[in-house]
């Protein structure tokens, strides 16, 4: 298994883009970026950090690039950066010893490109997770609703540095 650096960029300006990622090996094993999980809680009021479950499939929110351990072989790749960019859904080949994967996302040319996109009601996530998911989903605004309750912190996307 090789640790591969994966990056997605805007094809117009070559700047990194936050994105949603799903990679499944031809043997059915899902690839998981470092710092993310394949199995996580999906119950109401439980923040899930840098991953999400959509129609029974696990996706990972990535801030522009990630390190991902990959076996050589063919993978089905799904890479999306909101509705302003054409998603990439295709089969790719990872060769033995390959160190990097780079993807350019093409901007969509559609009538709503100058509109503001927002999620007006987000619960049970930290500001860092809301920023990551909103950016990867192509949102301009995320309205994070705060409330007070006591719960265990399990947000792997929020950990930066050493815990003391």
What are the residue ranges of the model-derived segments?
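Catalytic cores of extracellular degradative/oxidative enzymes
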Residues: 114-164
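Extracellular beta-sheet/turn segments enriched in Thr/Pro/Gly and aliphatic residues
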Residues: 92-110
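Extracellular Ig-like/FN3 beta-sandwich strand-entry sites
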Residues: 1, 72-74, 98
């Amino acid at each position: 298994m090789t640790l591969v650096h994966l990056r997605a960029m805007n094809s117009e300006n070559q700047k990194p883009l936050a994105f949603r990622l799903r990679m499944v090996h031809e043997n059915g094993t899902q690839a998981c970026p470092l710092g993310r999980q394949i199995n996580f809680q999906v119950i109401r009021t439980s923040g899930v950090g840098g991953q999400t479950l959509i129609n029974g499939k696990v996706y990972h929110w990535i801030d522009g690039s990630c390190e991902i351990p990959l076996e050589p072989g063919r993978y089905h790749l799904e890479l999306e950066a909101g509705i302003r960019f054409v998603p990439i859904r295709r089969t790719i080949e990872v060769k033995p010893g390959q160190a990097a994967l780079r993807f350019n996302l093409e901007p969509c040319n559609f009538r709503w490109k100058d509109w503001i996109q927002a999620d007006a009601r987000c619960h049970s996530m930290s500001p860092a997770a809301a920023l990551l998911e909103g950016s990867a989903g192509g949102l301009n605004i995320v309205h994070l609703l705060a409330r007070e309750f006591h719960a265990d912190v399990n947000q792997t996307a929020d950990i930066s540095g050493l815990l003391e």
